């Protein structure tokens, strides 16, 4: 395909948001520019419930540090303009993610395998997958001792002691950051989880959102 002058592709929409697609994105965008992209938020094929996108592309005339192209979301027929930057691995929301990843590393998660972890068990819980009537979010709840194989729910363990009031403020701030992030990226920033355009967040990204929230709150206090 890399020898083509251009064409049309139909692929999973996670191509634009998944960290694991980094090398594929780099190879593609080092060679091609996208002309226009359609994103489908409903099931399009019988054999898969995953959301897909289609886009037309052409071979680059010159190497560039960023590309901008129109995106239409179906069936809503909403039109957006999307910019992807090379320095952020051509990833949707890459600039924002870089800021999040640069936050101090303060959190891990509580597991049955390590019920007495080094650090402080909090009441901060992350629900990592959108539900039908509830988006992925942070909440305050009793500690959940998860399995090593868990991917959807976790209680955070902090390297610093946090009052319950501070934990509640972190939850509120982190949820606002996630809401703003999804809005700014037209809800294309997190990877899709199976059907109905549901999104998911990995534990490491969740830790980073919580850490950035704490850092912003402490900066405000100072």
Model segments located where?
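A generic alpha-helix propensity feature with a strong bias for hydrophobic helices
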Residues: 15, 73, 78, 107, ...
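C-terminal target-recognition/interaction regions appended to catalytic cores
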Residues: 116-222
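Extended accessory and catalytic-adjacent subdomains in large enzymes
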Residues: 42-50
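Flexible, glycine-/basic-rich loop-and-beta segments that form/coincide
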Residues: 49-112
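Conserved Class I SAM-dependent methyltransferase catalytic core
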Residues: 1-41
